[in-house]
């Protein structure tokens, strides 16, 4: 990469000159289903900016800079790069993010979207719009990111499917129609029509990233090119000529400049969606305008560990200008930090720059405590609200136990794991204080494979990884009676019942429409109007567990000293939600209600060691008397298969408790949408391939939590408890509280 860096340095002054003018900046990134050709497309763009030699582009996978990505030919992390490109006689700076397409890595996509204003959605011409395409487009539209379309692998339509020029045209129209249907479904109302793809306006390109050519309909019309000419180019062997006349990088970068808005335009509609502050304030106005002279506000989108420089935070400057030596305040962490260095990215290389103004993507050294999703501001404005929290679509549902072969290396391993979780918040780390057991949870088996590979690379230590275990959730199916929890010293008594939390409230928590730090009256109004809550109950919410979707409500009145122990009760609530009484799995969808309390007057007798166990024990007794059950994670499968094999594929799914939700058929392909428990998904790949003689594509992603089948529940909970070294028998309420 050293030659690449030299080329960049030559342009650094020019890049900084453009960076000051938001109209000449574009923030975009690739979004796609796995293997549809995003990274190969990105490499072609690097070639255009002189960062890769033409011979190498398309094979180099330069943006796949973690070695495992090159081995597996798949992007795992989101990589950033700033490109210099001249268009219509004007220089532009295009900040480009390459994101992973594999479903296990949607967390990286979510974080990248925060810094983009537009997304180049890459779709394989043969496979068309797939589940992951739908997921990333939906996420992009939720973040008000405008999509444009690149239909890749046109060569496959010609060489593999041997389609005629008319059939190719039909295939492209079908993909555009499917893509526009997603925009119709998920786009904000004011952009449903504006953001639909119109091929005639050049909002779609088609081509082959591998063969480095790409063309839009207006370009084709201008040059007098028809689909038959493209078919000829492949059949008569002059594809290189296509790549010379219509280089992919020029087509894509021109499309980005024309159809993706500059930051000062995009922020006018994105800021009201991403930031809940006062838009008429000094900060609000600067954010809407992407004003480089306004107060500094930066949204952090990812954090990476650098072996030499420590933690590097990457984010977008939404207003102001960040300079080396500036102090920033990390909202939410209540910390002031000094920026030691500012950089821009060129793939894996970071180039030091003296400053970066609003509208650009920047990397910062010195803000070690910042995390993905954090907001950094000028300390004079430390009171402003932060950017909205990021929503991760998938949840960690698969767990492995990690054990060092040499116990002396435990601390080193734990440190490295903590760094991994900082870099990738969709990983979940639990360390059992008593046994020292390390449990790492991820979104899928591949996610964990890559995390453990990175761990080995970084620590150079030997450790064992257990076979993957599935994470479950515990919940209740009815309202319990009231149970009394006594503190160990018998001086405090707390009375609780639990009941199921309704789906609407869970959705309001998931979409962050209601949050713990919201003004209580505003929150109560939303709960009353949208979820039918009673006013007093809605106002009595003490805490919202937005990780597992549970709430605790205070329904008492006039109890002495209750305010003094409120925090301890909330801590006891959170403690009990992390591992329920059935099988020590997290609780989900539970409303915990405090109805009465007797609190000792002396603070020495009502500390956390008294109140937390009393809370937890009463909640556990209540859960066990409210028809508790397990929820298991289901995956959604989207399958494309030759019609002759539908029967065989269906019987494989049935055997694994799968359920077909939808089926459509075209002449050479059938499309099935199904749900399948994660528990049943481990060896299904081989079975599906065998059933369809290899003629099958499919993709999986997390769908939802569903109740475990009643007929299998008792035995399964016992097995689960045994695996965890617990007593096999399911506990009774009286194991936690005294009954008179």
UniProtKB/Swiss-Prot annotation:
InterPro entries: EFG_II, EFG_III/V, EFG_V-like, EFTu-like_2, P-loop_NTPase, Ribosomal_Su5_D2-typ_SF, Ribsml_uS5_D2-typ_fold_subgr, Small_GTP-bd. The modification Diphthamide is found at residue 605. GTP binds at residues 32-39, 98-102, 152-155. CDD domains: aeEF2_snRNP_like_IV, EF2, EF2_II, EF2_snRNP_III, Elongation_Factor_C. It is found in: Cytoplasm. SMART domains: EFG_C, EFG_IV. Residues 23-264 form the tr-type G domain. It comes from the Archaea. Its main location: cytoplasm. The keyword Nucleotide-binding applies. One of its GO terms (molecular function) is GTPase activity. It holds the Pfam family GTP_EFTU_D2. NCBIfam families: aEF-2, small_GTP. Catalyzes the GTP-dependent ribosomal translocation step during translation elongation. During this step, the ribosome changes from the pre-translocational (PRE) to the post-translocational (POST) state as the newly formed A-site-bound peptidyl-tRNA and P-site-bound deacylated tRNA move to the P and E sites, respectively. Catalyzes the coordinated movement of the two tRNA molecules, the mRNA and conformational changes in the ribosome. Belongs to the TRAFAC class translation factor GTPase superfamily. Classic translation factor GTPase family. EF-G/EF-2 subfamily. This is Elongation factor 2. It comes from Pyrobaculum aerophilum (strain ATCC 51768 / DSM 7523 / JCM 9630 / CIP 104966 / NBRC 100827 / IM2). The gene is fusA.
């Amino acid at each position: 990469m050293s030659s690449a860096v030299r080329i960049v340095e030559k342009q650094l002054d020019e890049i900084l000159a453009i960076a000051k003018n938001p109209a000449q900046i574009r923030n975009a990134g690739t979004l796609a289903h796995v293997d549809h050709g995003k990274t190969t497309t990105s490499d072609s763009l690097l070639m255009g900016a002189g960062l890769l030699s033409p011979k190498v582009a398309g094979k180099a996978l330069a943006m796949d800079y973690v070695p495992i990505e090159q081995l597996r030919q798949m992007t795992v992390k989101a990589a950033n790069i700033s490109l210099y490109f001249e268009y219509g006689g004007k220089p532009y700076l295009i900040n480009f993010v390459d994101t992973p397409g594999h479903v296990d890595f949607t967390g990286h996509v979510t974080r990248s979207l925060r810094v983009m204003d537009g997304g180049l959605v890459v779709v394989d011409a043969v496979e068309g719009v797939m589940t992951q395409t739908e997921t990333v487009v939906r996420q992009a539209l939720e973040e008000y990111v405008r999509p444009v379309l690149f239909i890749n692998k046109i060569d496959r339509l010609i060489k593999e499917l041997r389609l005629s020029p008319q059939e190719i045209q039909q295939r492209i129209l079908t993909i555009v129609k499917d893509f526009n249907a997603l925009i119709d479904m998920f786009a904000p109302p004011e952009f449903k029509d504006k953001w639909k793809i119109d091929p005639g306006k050049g909002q779609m390109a088609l081509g082959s990233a591998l063969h480095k050519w790409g063309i839009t309909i207006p370009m084709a019309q201008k040059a007098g090119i028809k689909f038959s000419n493209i078919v000829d180019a492949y059949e008569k062997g002059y594809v290189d000529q296509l790549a010379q006349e219509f280089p992919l990088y020029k087509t894509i970068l021109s499309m980005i400049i024309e159809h993706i808005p500059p930051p000062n335009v995009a922020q006018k509609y994105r800021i009201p969606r991403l930031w809940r502050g006062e838009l008429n304030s000094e900060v609000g106005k600067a954010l809407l305008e992407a004003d480089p002279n306004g107060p500094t506000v930066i949204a952090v989108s990812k954090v990476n560990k650098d072996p030499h420089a420590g933690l590097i935070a990457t984010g977008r400057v939404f207003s102001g200008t960040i300079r080396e030596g500036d102090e920033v305040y990390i909202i939410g962490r209540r910390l002031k930090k000094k920026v030691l260095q500012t950089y821009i990215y060129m793939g894996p290389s970071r180039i030091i720059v003296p400053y970066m103004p609003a509208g650009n993507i920047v990397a910062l050294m010195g803000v070690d405590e910042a995390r993905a999703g954090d907001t950094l501001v000028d300390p004079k404005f430390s009171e402003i609200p932060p950017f909205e929290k990021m929503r991760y679509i998938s949840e960690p549902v698969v767990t492995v136990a990690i054990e060092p072969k040499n116990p002396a290396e435990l601390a080193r391993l734990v440190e490295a794991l903590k760094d991994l979780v900082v870099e990738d918040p969709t990983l979940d780390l639990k360390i059992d204080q008593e046994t020292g057991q390390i449990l790492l949870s991820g979104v899928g088996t591949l996610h964990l494979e890559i995390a453990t590979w990175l761990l080995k690379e970084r620590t150079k230590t030997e450790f064992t990884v257990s076979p993957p275990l599935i994470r479950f959730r515990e919940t209740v199916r009815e309202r319990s009676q009231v149970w009394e929890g006594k503190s160990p010293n018998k001086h405090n008594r707390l009375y609780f019942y639990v009941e199921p939390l309704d789906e609407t409230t869970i959705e309001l928590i998931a979409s962050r429409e209601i949050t713990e730090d919201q003004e209580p009256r505003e929150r109560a109004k939303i709960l009353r109007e949208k979820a039918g809550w009673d006013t007093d109950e809605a106002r009595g919410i003490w805490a919202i567990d937005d990780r597992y979707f549970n709430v605790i409500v205070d329904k008492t009145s006039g109890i002495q000293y209750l305010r003094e122990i409120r925090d301890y009760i909330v801590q006891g609530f959170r403690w009990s939600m992390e591992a329920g009484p059935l099988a020590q799995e997290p609780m989900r969808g539970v409303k915990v209600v405090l109805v009465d309390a007797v609190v000792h007057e002396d603070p020495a007798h009502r500390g956390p060691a008294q109140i937390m166990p009393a809370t937890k024990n009463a909640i556990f007794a209540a859960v066990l008397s409210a028809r508790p059950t397990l929820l298991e994670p289901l995956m959604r499968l989207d399958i494309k298969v030759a019609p002759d094999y539908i029967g065989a594929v269906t019987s494989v799914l049935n055997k694994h408790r799968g359920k077909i939700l939808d089926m459509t058929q075209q002449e050479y392909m059938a499309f099935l949408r199904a749900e399948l428990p994660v528990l049943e998904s481990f060896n299904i790949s081989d079975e599906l391939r065998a059933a369809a003689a290899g003629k099958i594509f499919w993709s999986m992603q997390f769908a939802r939590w569903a109740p475990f089948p009643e007929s299998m529940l008792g035995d399964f909970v016992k097995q689960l408890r045994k695996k965890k070294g617990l007593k096999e028998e399911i506990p009774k309420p009286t194991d936690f509280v005294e009954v008179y």
